[in-house]
Design a protein with these regions (language model features):
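Helix-turn-helix
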Residues: 6, 10-48, 52
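Short amphipathic alpha-helical elements of helix-turn-helix/winged-helix folds
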Residues: 10-14, 87, 142
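Hydrophobic alpha-helical connector segments
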Residues: 52, 66-91, 139
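Short, basic, alpha-helical segments at the C-terminal edge of helix-turn-helix-like DNA-binding modules
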Residues: 55-61
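Short alpha-helical scaffolding segments that buttress acidic/His motifs in well-ordered protein cores
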Residues: 81-84, 98, 102, 139, ...
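Amphipathic alpha-helical segments used for helix-helix packing
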Residues: 88-110
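Hydrophobic/aromatic-rich alpha-helical bundle segments in the mid-to-C-terminal region
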Residues: 111-116, 120-123, 129-174
Length: 174
């Protein structure tokens, strides 16, 4: 892992635990375990730190979802929602970091672009896993809804989304 990736990983953890508004750049420097000069060399603004953290988390999340992935179809969807539940429990108990960044920086074009790219990639992955590109946007909404509901509902949100996804892809919903 390069120094920049290592810093992005530590920034991801800091933002995940403390949110985007609370940590100052000095606190982020401490969390990244580098000097302020080194931090700014790799990420010249707090917004670029957010983008670096989001990019790192995006790659980590997609790798996590693909780990042990069965062939496209029902088993792959079940796998995805089970992995989502594990991710929420262990890595995102407060909800989706990308959406938190979007809310914290609503007008920042680079952050909006990073979040939008993450969401587009999720729709593409759902299309591939389900083998049903026609329902991928609806599957995406189930994925996002489960992520958003996690802090209140926990595993019940995941189970409900998985159940609805299976009904949707099997054609039991109109």
């Amino acid at each position: 892992m390069s120094l920049q990736q290592d810093i992005a990983s530590r920034l991801e953890q800091a933002f995940s635990h403390r949110g985007f508004a609370e940590p100052s750049v000095a606190e982020l420097k401490t969390a990244a375990e580098v000097s302020l000069r080194t931090l700014y060399r790799h990420f010249p603004s707090k917004e670029s730190m957010v983008i670096g953290a989001l990019a790192h988390r995006h790659a980590r999340y997609l790798d996590f979802l693909r780990e042990g992935l069965p062939a496209p179809g029902k088993a792959a969807l079940v796998h995805l929602f089970q992995r989502l539940g594990q991710w929420m429990k262990n890595d995102a108990p407060h909800g989706c970091l990308s959406m938190s960044a979007f809310v914290a920086f609503p007008g920042h074009p680079d952050i909006v672009d990073a979040v939008s790219q993450h969401k587009r990639d999720m729709i593409q992955l759902l299309a591939e896993l389900s083998g049903r590109p026609d329902v991928a946007p609806a599957l995406f909404l189930l994925h996002e809804g489960a992520s958003a509901a996690w802090p209140l509902m926990g595993e019940h949100a995941i189970h409900a989304a998985e159940h609805a996804a299976l009904q949707l892809t099997e054609g039991n919903l109109s």
